[in-house]
Amino acid sequence: MLAMAKKNNKPKMVSLFSGCGGLDLGFERAGFEIVFANDFDKDAQAVYRLNIGEIDGRDIHTISETEIPDCDILTAGFPCQPFSNAGNRKGVHDSRGMLYKECIRIISEKMPKVVVFENVKGLLSTKYIDGRNLPDVIIDDLSNMNGVGYNVQHRLLNASDYGVPQNRQRVVFVGIRKDIAKEFIFPVEQPKDKLTLKYVLDIPSDVPNQVAWGLSPQQIEMIEYIPEGGSWKDVPYEHLAPRFKKIRDNMKKYHSPNFYRRFSRDEICGTITASAQPENCGIIHPTENRRYTIREVARIQTFPDSFLFIDDTQKNITAMYKVIGNAVPANLAYAVAKAIMEQIFRGE
């Protein structure tokens, strides 16, 4: 069994689909102790080990419930690509979309006091294979588990309401075991002080991971015409690639997409995605013709500067954008974790 040794009386946490550790970082900060973590992605594993600790790298289907230690709370950020607007939206028809059932299998055996699921907004409009809404399936699975079940609350949260300099909507489910007789109250929204990009991008030169993934010649040509706060709509027609000309010619048909958004220093950033492509996420620096560096993207996701990434090869540089884009912003995780700690575990 791969599990971290127990060190103290902190509430014990099992983390499934841990990614590079954004969610876990927030929960550790709130006072939880991670006793088991798992993720199948090797790039995410490497970053997790570098910063947080040991992580099981096996396919979750192959992990027996008996190999996972007992815990007070179980968290799971099961793969979001099947439900994401940035992905193909196959939902439960993508094999990854059914991975939450592996969480249910493990929860049913462990019955922790608290369960936390995190996923993208698209999950809310996803149908299960029997035609029911997937959120209803998740709630039913947890509510009726083992004759005890969980009181489940869920809410669509915008990370920018919880100290994250990014408009990033995520749905969070929190289930409290019914014998505890409490219902979770989500944390109140916080003031959006100092969340604009001008505060994020002021980085001392000695902070690590200040390397950027290069742009293609076509991308460079496009962004040279995009002013701070602008988008592809500012690019002269003659400098557009053929496929963008086709879209520009029929904006109504294509629902007026806003590609190549270049957020200004006085704005909160748009959603950072795993693909890190300027076409579909706010990845272009406000004043320089380049992608954000790894550190800049990490700051937008509220990873502290002490949290390290692996940038020794071009392959690893590209991979770091993926794992950061897939992560739960650490400050959002902390806000949820702190509320759980105060409502359920404080004073035990």
PLM regions with names:
Residues N8-K10:
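Phosphate-coordination loops involved in phosphoryl transfer and adenosine-cofactor binding
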Residues I34-D39:
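Conserved SAM-binding motif I beta-strand of class I
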